[in-house]
Amino acid sequence: YDVHLSPHLACYVDDVIDARKHNQVEHFTIPDDGFVLRPGQTYLGSTLEYTETRRFVPFLEGKSSVGRLGIDIHATAGKGDVGFCNHWTLEISVSQPVRVYAQMPIGQLIYFLVEGEVEVDYSNKASAKYNQRSSLPVESMMWKNAF
C-alpha cells in the first residue's frame, strides 16, 4: 500500500533536543515549488493517508526511488502497533540537499495479519502516547516515559 508525503513538515525549535523534556516544534507547509531538505536536520513529516490497523501489524518502509534520492523516512519506527489509527509521522533525514514535494510517493505500508485475539490494541492502551488524531507531524513524546 503506497503512502504519500503530506504538505505538512515540522522541525524542532531548539538546537539541542532533550529526551526528558517536551521539545517544541515549528510546523510549516511545503510550498507548491517544493522544499529543500538539508543534511544534519531532523524533519518530521506525515503521510497524506490516514490508516487504521485493528487486526494487522503495519510495517512502513521508504520507496526505493526515495532511498535512491538519499532520503530516509524513518529513524527507528518502521513497525506500527495493532490498533494505531492515525496519519504516520515520518522521521525524515537526507544525505544531501533534496527538494521534496507534497503528495509525492514517500513509502509503502506492508500489513501482517495478527493470529489470535488482541488483548489490548494501541488505541486502548493506557501508555499509548500517539493516540491524538492529527494530520500534522507529531513530535517525540519520550518525555512522557518515566526514566
Please annotate each region the language model reported.
Residues 1-147:
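DUTPase catalytic domain/fold
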